[in-house]
Amino acid sequence: SDLYCIKFFSKIIQTVGGKKYSPKRKQVYELTKALLKNDFKKRTLGNVCVLYNKDHIFFIREKRHLNYNLDIKVNKKYIFDGRFILISNVPGKLICSEKINYNNIPPNSPFYEFKNLINKTIPCLQTLEGKLVKPHLNIINQKNNSNESIKSNSFGLYLINRVLI
């Protein structure tokens, strides 16, 4: 049904965009209508860039409105972008990973074409010695006790899953 589709897309956009509230129904409805047309390429809604390529729909966070100005202390939990819990066992400063190439997306992956857009939205930790630490990405459920799910890695980034709850 249309209402179910709108709610589903709204939750995805809310989670990816890091917003407290979902976008308005009318805007999501217009987005879903446009997806059914053959001329859809790219739209933005709720800080999310929605792209259609071949048989895939991609929801990628826009780089703007991201706050990287965090001084990270050892084993202290931070909320990054309203959707990630961040914890580190080394002190440092949070920086944008725009110039860092993760090279962990294989060329045959559907995400390969958008790897630069994805990398720009993932934070990186610059230690006090100047070393760059890539995050360990994980997903936790919002309903579970997050303290049990979060382990102290060198630099952990935990996505708070709001889509399936």
PLM features per residue range, with description:
Residues S1-I165:
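AMP-forming adenylation/ATP pyrophosphatase catalytic core
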